[in-house]
Amino acid sequence: MAPKKKPQKQSNKAASSSSSSKSNYQKPSSGPKLQISAENEDRLRRLLLNSGRSGPSIPAPISNSLSKAQKTKKLNNVYEKLSCEGFVDDQIELALSSLRDGATFEAALDWLCLNLPSHELPVKFSTGASRFPSTGGSVGVISTSRDDWNDSTDSSVRVEEEEPAVFVRVKGKQDEEDTLSSDKSSQADWIRQYMMRQEEEELECWEDEVDGIDPRNKVSGPRPFDVIAKEYYSARSDAIKAKEKRDKRGQEQAGLAIRKLKQEISDLGLSEAMLESEFQREHAFESATEQESTCPISDNLHESVDADDVSVQMLDNLTLNTNPAESYESEEIQTKALPSSSSGQDFVASDEDSEDVELGDTFFEEIPPSEISPHELLELQKEEKMRELRSEKNLGKLDGIWKKGEAQKIPKAFLHQLCQRSGWEAPKFNKETGEGRNFSYTVSILRKASGRGKNRQAGGLVTLQLPPKDENFESIEDAQNKVAAFALHKLFSDLPVHFAITEPYASLVLIWKQEELLCTTIQSTEEDRRANFVDKLLEEDSFSLTTSSSSFENSLPLVDSYVKDKDDLGVVKSNNRAKRDSYIEAECLSLQRKQENKKRTQKYKDMLKTRTALPISEVKNGILQHLKEKDVLVVCGETGSGKTTQVPQFILDDMIDSGHGGYCNIICTQPRRIAAISVAQRVADERCESSPGLDDSLVGYQVRLESARSDKTRLLFCTTGILLRKLAGDRTLNDVTHIIVDEVHERSLLGDFLLIILKSLIEKQSCDNTSRKLKVILMSATVDADLFSRYFGHCPVITAQGRTHPVTTHFLEEIYESINYLLAPDSPAALRSDTSIKDKLGSVNDRRGKKNLVLAGWGDDYLLSEDCLNPFYVSSNYNSYSDQTQQNLKRLNEDRIDYELLEELICHIDDTCEEGAILIFLPGVAEIYMLLDMLAASYRFRGPAADWLLPLHSSIASSEQRKVFLRPPKGLRKVIAATNIAETSITIDDVVYVIDSGKHKENRYNPQKKLSSMVEDWISQANARQRTGRAGRVKPGICFSLYTRYRFEKLMRPYQVPEMLRMPLVELCLQIKLLGLGHIKPFLSRALEPPSEGAMTSAISLLHEVGAVEGDEELTPLGHHLAKLPVDVLIGKMLLYGGIFGCLSPILSIAAFLSYKSPFIYPKDEKQNVDRVKLALLSDNGVSSSDLNNNDRQSDHLLMMVAYDKWVKILQERGMKAAQRFCESKFLSSSVMRMIRDMRVQFGTLLADIGLINLPKTGEFSGRKKENLDVWFSDPTQPFNMYSQQPEVVKAILCAGLYPNIAANDKGITETTFNSLTKQGNQTKSYSAWYDGRREVHIHPSSINSNFKAFQNPFLVFLEKVETNKVYLRDTTIVSPFSILLFGGSINVHHQSGSVTIDGWLKVAAPAQTAVLFKELRLTLHSILKDLIRKPEKSGIVHNEVVKSMVHLLIEEGKPQHK
């Protein structure tokens, strides 16, 4: 069997020629070289092959709609391509058998590269080095043996012998011809094996003859041509002799034998002329032998014996009974047998016997009869074609060009003649430059187009060159003639040019023609085997399908049995249902009796009297009546109406009183955890029951990481996310009777999402006409009731009046007047004339706040103004106020919070106002702690008063949140600093005074970061009224608004923009897929106010980039886990991988900084000092986690991690004041550090919530114990921190989280991308230029990498882009190619060239075997995540052998590469 082709190694000459032709062209390198030690590679391969995966993922099978012919064509195509790449049949068939009819060329290459040992692969796949570098338009025509040829019967057999080759380069043609050329690369090997088998058969036949066995009687069927020719010669000879003797009987017998032999040769598809030609040749040969004892080889051969100069006459003799490629071997044998010092006669006399052995035995001895194979038949046909080619009958094609008898011409002259005759330009011979190429030439010919229609031949410049093996020229003339002969062969293949040109060039032309004819033989033999294999493979698949179908039919009795068993099971279930209904009925009676007994108690009567006084009680009957008639109801109650606590109780009491209490299951959603907990506790108190969740209480609550419910719970308060999680397990909510959605006016993302689901459920149950129906109640204080009513099919709306005490509102200008406040010119809240434009833009200074950074990016005009005037100041509005107040308003920067004013105002309230708690609304946690720190440091709030300075936000523990509802001792004032969490749902009874900053933080998508982040912004008028209402819940109150009346009336929005219209939809899309709600866009288009098409497309695209979904929006294992983490998907991915790869603590810190902001502050004119401090932090190896070498300094994110670790160590060892001094000395923000600690705990508990890590089993981490939980997450002995001190691992996980925020220099991008990039100038740069795939970008001056000129790797990940006069990358980290391949975008392995592209523009040079290894590692990681879904409690995943090997790879191989 013929081996498959493998490109031949190119010699140094060709390499130098190829390189020299483009020596002046500068382009990117082949990419950073990815090299793995043999030990690592072998270990990883063994692990992967033993991990339960047999190889690369098998693609989806071909559609069953394809016919067998189409499947056959596809598999044949793959087979052919693999063959051309140098794989042997056994290897190809093994791969295709594994991949079945779903095989693709790429999948088969992956399988082979992963499963075959390196030494069995074609060299270019095991080393990644292409043997023929691409030259942009070359065609290689190769006739050579493969170095590692595998016989189909024994893959261990190798034939290691180089053969001569011919190489053609035709400029302007496509590289696709390279594949065709490689088909010829191993023909000589095949021929050699074939000849060896022929010799064995000859020996057998010789033995048979010795034993007296007639070979003609031994076998039946077609016989070889040579046997027939021999008999034909014998019959003709007999006929001649009989004619001479006038023996008529002998003539008749000979004639009959001749006719039979002619019929036999005709049956073989050969012409009778071949027999006659053979007879004439043998007859002439015999006559010549009788006349003189000389060799049949022409004397011309002996005059010039050279491997390249073989005469036509010699070719006639040598190629008669063999294929062309064998002639190379014959030449070598013949040359060795000819001593250069002897004449031809001497040679014949001395080596005749040797020649008989070496040549005669192989080519001239008779071949005994045997069965003719299709290959042998084709071989004979090729011999006939070669005879025809050498026949003088072809001379007619040269009419008008050359006649027999005319002097032969040198190839140069004849080529010139033919070009002139064709109307082409004269050939031009170009000397090739390079070492060792003194006589190397190419020939270029400019051809004109000719012909029309289908026969039209395109013109153009064609350049041809001989391969290196033919470049041993005697002279310039010889070099030019050889390449001219080659041009004659290629360009005038229809003409017998060998007749018209001189030797040795005529023989070379014949050799080249023989090589072309040989391809058909090899291809035909291969096609037979391939066709049989593909047919068998498809038949097996068909049989498998038939068997499956048969098995299914045979299993019908089992199915019937199963149905019968199921029917029996149904009877059991029916009995169980009857018992359950009986139990519920008893429960209904029990609840009814308890309710009646409770109503008789005085405590309940007093509480009921208080409840009845609430305004919502006036519409109680209307609410209950509407719920009996309709499935959806909107309840609109103003602040203080009591709707949140009373409506759920109305429904519960009504069902209990009507005897249906046992069936009642009410779920009331709240937008925040604190609201769910506090409302549940209040309702339990009003019902005179025990605390929520106890057995004698019907009320319970459930929030993330905290639950208080039991089997007796009939009214559950929970967050929206908890209900959505319940929907994931029970999409019909069959056991729920009522769902109450409170505070729908907030239009939160999850709230609107829940409404879509509820609407679908209501519509479905209306169609099903079920007896038990779900009831939905929407409640809000301020709401566009008609909007919700229309959305739910014009459902009824009930409005209840509010009951609040009067509240007096003082705006900013009035506060200035009342406390006689002076805004200092150097106050942070004041605009200053000495503020530079750079400072106003705030491109670096994070102290100006996140909102200001965003505004700076938007280019607010007022920040660029050189005067000190507040752009929102309208002088006519303040004519009645003092000059001091007007000056304050003129220089006020309204985007900054004036903490000095806040402190003075709080002191003013404490001094002049009656008792009552103060509630201060601030935008975020950092602002809360900044204010509380200022107050705690003041004389007024020292001692016991400091205990009543209380924060209130979603991040603090529930026990700490509950303290805000307690009353302080007499003489002490409670001061609560809160986020907008206190706007709705919760009521703090003793709050009388409200200070409203007018700010809050919204979650917005930052397109530069490709992250969602909290952005500070102004609240709406509706929010402002809600905050004001908090002051009048128990008695008349006062609201101090820290914004002007003009802003409230003219600049604030009436309502908040729904989150679905302003937030990224990525997390929402994940929930849609997790709940199995169909395709994303159709589902979201049913929203109350659908998001834009662009927003949905962007979200889906990001999910694909992150790897959360694939294909037709199919949720991946990674996406399944991300859907359970209520964080940005990039942060979630980083957290997941941080836990899996054992470096959680540093990743918690980095994720927190990415979600919040950098801890570094930049005082004016202190940038150099800050940079120096940064380097000092990285250089100090005193902290274990900062054990970094010089190369690991190239990371802003590792710097943040080190800063936090140092801060928290000082905090634990020396206390808060020492930690504060550390921050001041290192230009760090203490408030940011505290926020990072809280976020670390929050992120860690999220991972514990999904089962990725384990939390301590003892103790509840609340209050001061939160610090202990952060210590737990930092514990290096925990499995999730096993590799937390390995910077290479941390940076790899960082890459996983930040990708696709990546940039590369010219060494890491593809040539196509590099040529299409927008670059800034062409001058030579002294710095390393970076690109983001579209344009040149620059590292921001605030990054630690901005001062480096050399980088360990050509890739970096970044947090965000900032565009001014240039595009800057903020917060960068240099990452290794290993990280990109493991955690980057989609990878495309270029097996042949030994390179990998990532997302189509990044590149890495890697051998095919190594690249496929990384591809498989990705799939294995995919499987690990999938396994984690099935076993979420499997927290020891970091001990997985594949994960450990990947970590080892990152640590050992990811070190700096010296280039």
Curated annotation (Swiss-Prot):
Residue ranges of domain Helicase C-terminal in the record: 901-1076
Coiled-coil residue spans: none
Presence of the UniProt keyword Hydrolase in the record: yes
Recorded superkingdom: Eukaryota
Record-listed ATP binding positions: G637, E638, T639, G640, S641, G642, K643, T644
PROSITE patterns referenced in this protein's UniProt entry, alphabetically: HELICASE_ATP_BIND_1, HELICASE_CTER
Domain Helicase ATP-binding residues, every copy: 624-801
Transit peptide: 1-37
Region of interest called Disordered, as start-end residue ranges on this chain: 1-42, 324-352
Annotated catalysed reactions: ATP + H2O = ADP + phosphate + H(+)
Subcellular location(s) per record: Plastid, Chloroplast
MF GO annotations: ATP binding; ATP hydrolysis activity; RNA binding; RNA helicase activity
Broad class of where this protein is predominantly found: plastid
A single GO cellular-component term on record: chloroplast
Biased composition (Low complexity): 9-30
Keyword Repeat: no
Enzyme class, broadest EC rank: hydrolase
Renumbered ranges of motif DEIH box: 742-745
Xref: SMART domains: DEXDc, HA2, HELICc
UniProt record similarity statement: Belongs to the DExH box helicase family.
Protein known as: DExH-box ATP-dependent RNA helicase DExH7, chloroplastic
Species, as recorded: Arabidopsis thaliana
